[in-house]
Swiss-Prot record:
GO terms for molecular function: protein phosphatase regulator activity. It comes from Xenopus tropicalis (Western clawed frog). The keyword Membrane applies. It is found in: Cytoplasm; Cytoplasm, Cytoskeleton; Membrane. Transmembrane segments: none annotated. PP2A consists of a common heterodimeric core enzyme, composed of a 36 kDa catalytic subunit (subunit C) and a 65 kDa constant regulatory subunit (PR65 or subunit A), that associates with a variety of regulatory subunits. WD repeats lie at residues 22-61, 87-128, 171-209, 220-260, 279-317, 334-375, 410-443. Keywords: Cytoplasm, Cytoskeleton, Membrane, Repeat, WD repeat. Belongs to the phosphatase 2A regulatory subunit B family. The B regulatory subunit might modulate substrate selectivity and catalytic activity, and might also direct the localization of the catalytic enzyme to a particular subcellular compartment. Negatively controls the initiation of oocyte maturation. PROSITE patterns: PR55_1, PR55_2, WD_REPEATS_1. One of its GO terms (cellular component) is cytoplasm. The keyword Disulfide bond does not apply. This is Serine/threonine-protein phosphatase 2A 55 kDa regulatory subunit B beta isoform.
Length: 443
């Protein structure tokens, strides 16, 4: 980034508002497409909302970074598994875009059990002048047809349609936590707590199990899969993380079932920091390759770590996200916040890392300058095109006017899901049921 991260002026824009929010309105995933022109969000009500970026306007250059609603559709419905007497939530766990091949857009969305491939396309013309149908679509009496008509296309108001093209189901016993599109653009993988499956985008009735960590005796279970992602360039390589804080790199060329990893990334635990909560806070909630595929970023409860693929024994960078919460782990355990799963993202050049925290705070770390900043996504501070001010958390002692005490943080306001535009300094931040777009200020 051209300027120091803590001195940059950041514009904000407030997109999605539900004054009377219900559980179904809570945003559960955020994802830009490969060009950054579209931004998709999924929520706990099973809906997908797609936003489209404003086109360039010389008269209003500041509107270029704004996103407006492009399409809204119901992706998943609540279901009931009668064999196991379990409700299957409609909540969208993940959205992943496929690279654009033509005028239409394609995306994968998943809830706990079922992945769907959606086609989002535009229509601004409609056919008229059928021989066997009238203009309302009713079948005409063949006896009344006296002339042959050539159907024509007439202009109509632009309509955006979302249609399900594939439904990939019945392959996961446990809850799906990740989907990742392969760099061959023909396959993708879906991961649940104990297994990872490989799918062909054209075939819905068959998948290949590539990782299975389920023990013969479930009482021997010591860890679960928490996230998985394909390498951005090598279609045979992928990583998955676990609740024990380990990351495994697997190569599908070595064997069809990748139960034996090629590399294991794990940081030795510091005995002086050992506590009752050590195993819980070391669980990895997100794993991401950088754009070159040389580095992996992981997020656990208190830190973000960057790993070099060539060095397995420790991360090359560790960033403290909210270390001031270390003294609060007991109360965070009691209110279940310690199990929150925060995501992390790279910027387009891999020089800055972003991840969320509590009190609607989100953190940015500049890898080059080692500077970091805490910003807040809230309606009070984020009027459209307002400049965000850095926030600081005070742990103890005297508190300055611009600081907030760690004891007054609101743990019900949390930023779990964030996304970064693939090439520009535009970010999307989901704060419970509200979506914020922030961008570098254009002078």
């Amino acid at each position: 980034m051209e300027e120091d991260i803590d001195t940059r002026k950041i514009n904000s824009s407030f997109l999605r508002d539900h004054s009377y929010a219900t559980e179904a309105d809570i945003i559960s995933t955020v994802e830009f497409n490969s060009t950054g022109e579209l931004l998709a969000t999924g929520d706990k009500g099973g809906r997908v909302v797609i936003f489209q970026r404003e086109q360039e306007n010389k008269n209003q250059p500041h509107r270029r970074g704004e996103y407006n609603v492009y399409s809204t559709f119901q992706s998943h419905e609540p279901e009931f598994d009668y064999l196991k007497s379990l409700e299957i939530e409609e909540k969208i766990n993940k959205i992943r875009w496929l690279p654009q091949q033509n005028a239409a857009y394609f995306l994968l969305s998943t809830n706990d059990k079922t992945v769907k491939l959606w086609k989002v396309s535009e229509r601004d013309k409609r056919p008229e002048g059928y021989n066997l149908k009238d203009e309302d679509g009713r079948i005409r009496d063949p006896c009344t047809i006296t002339s042959l008509r050539v159907p024509v296309l007439r202009p109509m108001d632009l309509m955006v349609e979302a249609t399900p093209r594939r439904v990939f189901s019945n392959a996961h016993t446990y809850h799906i936590n990740s989907i990742s599109v392969n760099s061959d653009y023909e396959t993708y993988m879906s991961a649940d707590d104990l297994r990872i499956n490989l799918w062909n985008l054209e075939i819905t009735n068959r998948s290949f199990n590539i990782v299975d960590i389920k023990p013969t005796n479930m009482e021997e279970l010591t860890e679960v899969i928490t996230a998985a992602e394909f390498h951005p360039h090598n279609c045979n390589t992928f990583v998955y993380s676990s609740s024990k804080g380990t990351i495994r790199l697997c190569d599908m060329r070595s064997s069809a079932l990748c139960d034996r990893h090629s590399k294991l990334f794990e940081e030795p635990e510091d005995p002086s920091n050992r506590s009752f909560f050590s195993e819980i806070i070391s669980s990895i909630s997100d794993v991401k390759f950088n754009h070159s595929g040389r580095y992996i970023m992981t997020r656990d409860y208190l830190t973000v770590k960057v790993w070099d693929l060539n060095m397995e024994n420790r991360p090359i960078e560790t960033y403290q996200v909210h270390d001031y919460l270390r003294s609060k782990l007991c109360s965070l355990y009691e209110n279940d916040c310690i199990f929150d799963k925060f995501e992390c993202v790279w910027n387009g050049s891999d020089s800055v890392i972003m991840t969320g925290s509590y009190n609607n705070f989100f953190r940015m770390f500049d890898r080059n300058t080692k500077r970091d900043v805490t910003l807040e996504a809230s309606r009070e501070n984020s009027k459209p095109r307002a400049i965000l001010k850095p926030r600081k958390v005070c742990v103890g002692g005297k508190r300055r006017k611009d600081e907030i005490s760690v004891d007054s943080l609101d743990f019900s306001k949390k930023i779990l899901h964030t996304a970064w535009h693939p090439s520009e300094n535009i970010i999307a931040v989901a704060a419970t049921n509200n979506l914020y777009i922030f961008q570098d200020k254009v002078n």
